[in-house]
Regions:
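Extracellular/virion structural assembly segments
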Residues: 1-119, 125-127, 132-134, 142-184
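Expand to "…catalyze enediolate/carbanion chemistry for C-C bond making/breaking, isomerization
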Residues: 137
Length: 184
């Protein structure tokens, strides 16, 4: 996947965000009340409903151009939600010696596919000797018995879900609502 990033920074534009999660469960219930259910999903379907009530014409042009580059709902991209930050979390070494970044959502662990703004600590001492590749980190100075913790921002791999429409409210003030859905 080419590295495409949502063009509007959540900190630079006025916005609102609603996050919802869904699991597609097929179920059947007998007359006696016995229930059978199955779920084919491994990961939840997370949806972001974003509203930008006051975008400038320049920001709207960026967003429209980005929507066109993604061919509407076809191509996925990276989106960083305002709350997508991990603070001082222990990360674990895999069999290759790399450390997988993850987010813990109330005990449900999701691997992070892309992170930035990373700070790494080996045995509570900050180190600058590390590399990041997507959601994996290599920390050459960490021994297998070392405790590695990290702080990072993580991105969601998403696509647009539906059309993009812009409402002009005043000169150089536009309102836009966007729906994004996670993809794997």
């Amino acid at each position: 996947m080419a590295e495409r990033f949502f063009p509007l920074d959540s900190g630079s534009a006025t916005w609102g965000s609603t996050i919802s999660q869904a699991w597609d469960v097929t179920q059947a219930e007998t007359a006696s009340g016995r229930r059978r259910a199955i779920c084919n999903q491994v990961f939840p379907k997370t949806t972001f409903n974003l509203s930008f009530p006051a975008l400038s014409d320049a920001d709207v042009n960026k967003l429209l151009g980005f929507y066109s580059k993604c061919k509407g709902t076809l191509l996925p991209f990276w989106y960083k939600d305002y709350g997508s930050r991990v603070e001082m979390q222990k990360i674990y070494r895999n069999s290759d010696g790399a450390y997988q970044c993850y987010t813990d959502q109330g005990g449900y662990i999701l691997a992070c596919e892309y992170v930035d703004n990373v700070r790494v600590y080996v045995d509570n001492i900050e180190t600058l000797d590390f590399t990041v590749n997507g959601g994996l980190m290599n920390v050459p100075g960490a021994k297998p018995a070392s405790v590695v913790t990290a702080c990072y921002d993580y991105y969601w791999r998403v696509r647009f879900d539906g059309n993009l429409s812009v409402t002009q409210t005043f000169a150089d003030i536009n309102s836009v609502s966007v729906k994004l859905v996670t993809v794997r």
